[in-house]
Structures are given as C-alpha cells and as structure tokens.
Amino acid sequence: MEIDRPMSGGRSLVTVVDRIADRLNAQPKCGLMVGIDGVDGVGKTTFADDLGDALRARGREVIRSSADGFHNPRSVRYHLGRLSPEGFYRHSYNYPLLQRVLLQPLTAQGSRRFRFAAFDHATDRPIEAEEQIASDEAILIFDGLFLHRPELRGYWDFTVFLDAPFEVTIPRGASRGPGFGDPDPAATSNRRYIEGNRLYLDECKPRQVASVVIDHSDLTRSNIVTWND
C-alpha cells in the first residue's frame, strides 16, 4: 500500500481519521483488515469507531469488532494471579478462537462467514453470536491490545498504533467510570496493566512495525509521528 509521508505538526483527530480513511478507500475494492492498537486507555475504541464512520461515509461496508469479544475465561486470564503482568500480556485473549471465527474467514481465501464476538468477559461465558456473511469489499476495523503479536500480525493489511504515556492513559481510562481502575499510575492495581503493556512494547515493538503511529496524548490534537507503510 503506497502512502505518502504525512506533514509534520499536530492535526485535529477528525483530520487524521479522514486522512487514513482516504488512503484505505483509495485501495482496490476488496476486503481489508485494519487493526487499531495501543495501550489501555489510549482511545482505541473511539478512534476505530470514528474511522469506521469515515469509511461508511465514503460508501464502504465496515465490519466493526474488538478484542473485547475474544477474552479468555477468568480461570485462564488469572491463573498466574490477578496482579500478574505476565498473565495479563500472555493470557488475556483467546487468539485461536479469534483467528477461527473472525480473522481467518475474512482473509482472501476465507469463507466470509464470521462472528463479531465469541466471549463475554463480564459474565465469563461464551457468546452464541449469529454468524454473519461479509461481502468481498467489506473492511474489518478491529481495535484491541497487543495487535502486533506474532499470532495476529500477519492478518493486518494496515495498522494504527495510538501512542501516549501511561501518565495520560491510566487516568484517561479510569475516567470512563466505576470499574475502570484507579486513576493513579502508581497504584498497585495498575502495575498489572502497565508492566504487561511494557512486555508487549518490548517484545513486539509496535511503534516500529505499525503502518501509522499517532501521538494520541491530546485527543483534540493528534500528531502523526511516523508513517511506516
């Protein structure tokens, strides 16, 4: 995918989203798989929703899904302990399930029969979601943690890594309401998430391999840091 280098300087989030949507929409009318990556609280879901809306406004069919629908059961997620950074990084998500019911069906050789989600982490139960059929032109917009892990990296045609320091993302994530954690980055309960994300950043180096890296520290003024694709 040939994409010109971005201009320097911050831009509004709408401008950045539109820039990416224009590049994706300019590709041949075949299915694309797009991953929106970043640490907890950086703003992945909102960015992915906005990108999906921008593509729909350009006449594209969008499949919108998230890693939140593919957690492992609690017994797997916490088997190294509820505060384990290693457990958070290694065991939060069921990658074979994600591959089987969503990613593999949407590849060029896939059946196009997929499910948006397969597990409800709030109830700790599988979701009996109805199978859907994607058109050949549908674009998958998928947000979640750890999307540049080896298990997933080969599926994406284009990725965005939203970057911001933990001093910003931890209180931002906590501001979503009760149940979203302590706003203090130094709180013991946040060590699991911060250190788990650091394991991912060190092992998979998403800043170096993502198609686009965006400084998302200021939600009103996003800056395209690198355009690697």
Regions of interest found by a model, annotated:
Residues D40:
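The conserved Walker
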Residues F47:
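Hydrophobic positions on the alpha1 helix immediately C-terminal to the Walker A/P-loop
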Residues K44:
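Conserved lysine of the Walker
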Residues R125-G179:
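ATP-dependent NMP and nucleoside kinases share a basic, alpha-helical "lid"
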Residues M1-Q27, G154, F158, E167, ...:
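NTP-dependent small-molecule kinase module
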